[in-house]
Every structure is written in structure tokens, then in C-alpha cells.
């Protein structure tokens, strides 16, 4: 398959792309930026419409969650960061699920840590899960 982006870029035989979005993009100043997330959803949808499988990797749960915890500063301790991530992860998934639902796209999340990559059994399990999601058209 040959695909091109809106900029005319030729994707050649590319089948799958990984889009990485960091906290500085989606949660500047500790708040999720809905217009930015909307734009990401549109761009991802455009890629999918061109026949590409898209894996969206999003960081930013800590940045999105610390204000929701009532804090006015980024968390420093491991416990604070984990609590902020727990709050922020829900906010991220809620917002992404909403913007992609408008585009008839189901989203899923895989939460992974370094140990999941280093342990062969856990890595293979995550890979098989991702392959199953992609085969069903789930983002």
C-alpha cells in the first residue's frame, strides 16, 4: 500500500506507525489541553483512514493529575507521582475515549513498565494483546 500524508509525504510500504505524545504537548501547565487532544485525534484518524495501523503512545498522566489532586506543584516523591498518575491516567483515558468515540474508534490502554519489556513472558503477553487490539481496529 502506498499512502501519503496531507503534506504529500509518501509512506511507501509502511503499515504501522507509532505516534508518541508527551506531557508537554497535551498537558502544559498541568491541565489537559482539549484542542490539542482533538487535533491529535484528527491526525490519528487521518492516518487510519489511509490504511495505517496506529499505536498511540501517550505520556502525561502525572502532569495531568497533579492539579486534580489539589496540588499546585509537580509531585516529587514516588508516592506523590504514583497518586498523580492514577488521577491523570483516568483523565487521559476519559478525554481520549470521548474524542475518538466521536470518530467511531474504540480506544484501549496498555500500561507498561520497563519490567514488562525486560521479562520475556510479560513482553510476549503485551505484544500479543497489542496485536489482538490492532487486528480488531482498536486504537
Model-found features: residue ranges?
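Nucleotide/pyrophosphate-binding catalytic subdomain
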Residues: 1-139
